[in-house]
Amino acid sequence: MLKIGVRLPRRFEDSGDYLADARAVESAGADSLWLDGEGYDPWLLLAGVATITGRIRLVAPVSSADLGAPHDLGAKLATLSRLSRGRVVLTVGGAANGAAPVAAALELARGHRCHVLLEAASDRRAGLADGVVGLGESPERFRAAVEPIARFREREKLAGAFECWATIKMPDDRETWRRLRQEYEQAGATGLIVPADPRLLDLLRNGDDEEDRSDLGLAQG
């Protein structure tokens, strides 16, 4: 089954509402919580979310600067991993992609038993990580980007689980939601990342139900 990740903003007015949104997303069945690129410190935000959730995975962004200070990064990862009871996933940004940064992130992550996903990774060596994020702007482009990585993993006999995440806009309705999930899953995606939206909770809970159009029937007599 396709996993669903929800991308939360990194800015908010009321911390109580923000944490309540995170709990609601977990209750609705989402696999993971992701964060926008700009705003408050992501590690502090995820630490707060970790204390009020119990199942959902917490995706922490890792930058080139983070990898340049491995001791500090290790301390942050150890803290968040302990608070979340092992629910942390690391994403390495596009600017940090490359053999050395990826190897450093993987070594650090293995010590804390967490996965590493590469963002916007087009290099087949991305197959050495645990997954990739943000490939392509359509199911067709997604498939074209994933296939070389899949062939690399097959050639290198890398048989472990590998996650392929696509980022989409908030669907307009349930029919679009069903169609996008089907198309991306057929293209090789294992997960979709969707921006937080009040309508998303209903899609997560009832996305496979037919929309009630009885009001149209009544209006038409």
Regions found by a protein language model. Give the residues of each.
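Active-site-adjacent structural elements that line small-molecule/cofactor binding pockets in enzymes
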Residues: 1-221
